[in-house]
Curated annotation (Swiss-Prot):
InterPro entries: Cerberus, Cys_knot_C, Cystine-knot_cytokine, DAN. It is found in: Secreted. One of its GO terms (cellular component) is extracellular space. Keywords: Cytokine, Disulfide bond, Glycoprotein, Secreted, Signal. PANTHER family: CERBERUS, DAN DOMAIN FAMILY MEMBER 5. Disulfide bonds join 162-209, 176-223, 186-239, 190-241. Cytokine that may play a role in anterior neural induction and somite formation during embryogenesis in part through a BMP-inhibitory mechanism. Can regulate Nodal signaling during gastrulation as well as the formation and patterning of the primitive streak. The lineage of its organism: Eukaryota, Metazoa, Chordata, Craniata, Vertebrata. N-glycosylated. GO terms for biological process: anterior/posterior axis specification; anterior/posterior pattern specification; bone mineralization; cell migration involved in gastrulation; cellular response to cadmium ion; determination of dorsal identity; determination of heart left/right asymmetry; gastrulation. Forms monomers and predominantly dimers. The keyword Protease does not apply. Residues 1-17 form the signal peptide. This is Cerberus.
Length: 267
């Protein structure tokens, strides 16, 4: 009887120690299984933090598998605090103010747009000066064409055309009031003809853009003198390319190969 009690007293502590060791082994075997599960549930538990700060440990899963839970959490917080400023959006972009709706462009883009507008403002006067120079060079070479701006396109210089161009003709006389008459001038580019043959029989004729249909108008002027002054003005209606004759009134302006006929005025 005493021997039996002695054996029971000895075996009871041994059984407790073995069960305690088995429990530790079970916990150690279950901890690797629970650890990845807790790590998988970590982003879902803190969903707002995952949206603002992306998980940097997705690209390096071996760091999470080998490190304990506490050490991995500290390392995670350290990495997020270091790189969080690159990923977190500023509050001004996440919550735009009302003033930003009224602004058409951000301040940064305005500084870039202003120099471009400045360049456009600088280029526009140059184009205007170029147009003025072109009109001065082509149509203001002689005193007869001074002050006349003609509606002629620049590409028509290279065409063989002859047409009427409307303009306002000013009739003046000394001691009289000036009168403005709406008239047409002939503008265009005509060709030349050369007939081959012997040296003494060869003939070359050049055609000019001249009036084909016109009328004359007697225009009386209001003068301070007692004698009245009447001007005869040729009003051009149609133009065509033809050879210039001596009896036709008016004068031809030569601008390179381009010819212009302005109707003359006789007293």
């Amino acid at each position: 009887m005493h021997l039996l009690l002695f054996q029971l007293l000895v075996l009871l502590p041994l059984g407790k120690t073995t069960r305690h060791q088995d429990g530790r082994q079970n916990q150690s075997s279950l901890s690797p299984v629970l650890l990845p599960r807790n790590q998988r549930e970590l982003p879902t538990g803190n969903h707002e933090e995952a949206e603002e700060k992306p998980d940097l440990f997705v690209a390096v899963p071996h760091l999470v598998a080998t490190s304990p839970a506490g050490e991995g959490q500290r390392q995670r917080e350290k990495m997020l605090s270091r790189f969080g400023r690159f990923w977190k959006k500023p509050e001004r972009e996440m919550h735009p103010s009302r003033d930003s709706d009224s602004e058409p462009f951000p301040p940064g883009t305005q500084s870039l747009i202003q120099p471009i507008d400045g360049m456009k403002m600088e280029k526009s006067p140059l184009r205007e000066e170029a147009k003025k120079f072109w009109h001065h060079f082509m149509f203001r070479k002689t005193p007869a064409s001074q002050g006349v701006i003609l509606p002629i396109k620049s590409h028509e210089v290279h065409w063989e055309t002859c047409r009427t161009v409307p303009f306002s003709q000013t009739i003046t006389h000394e001691g009289c009031e000036k009168v403005v008459v709406q008239n047409n001038l002939c503008f265009g580019k005509c060709g030349s003809v050369h007939f081959p043959g012997a040296a003494q029989h060869s003939h070359t004729s050049c055609s000019h853009c001249l009036p084909a249909k016109f009328t004359t108008m007697h225009l009386p002027l209001n003068c301070t003198e007692l004698s009245s002054v009447i001007k005869v003005v040729m009003l051009v209606e149609e133009c065509q390319c033809k050879v210039k004759t001596e009896h036709e009134d008016g004068h031809i302006l030569h601008a390179g190969s381009q010819d212009s006929f302005i109707p003359g005025v006789s007293a």
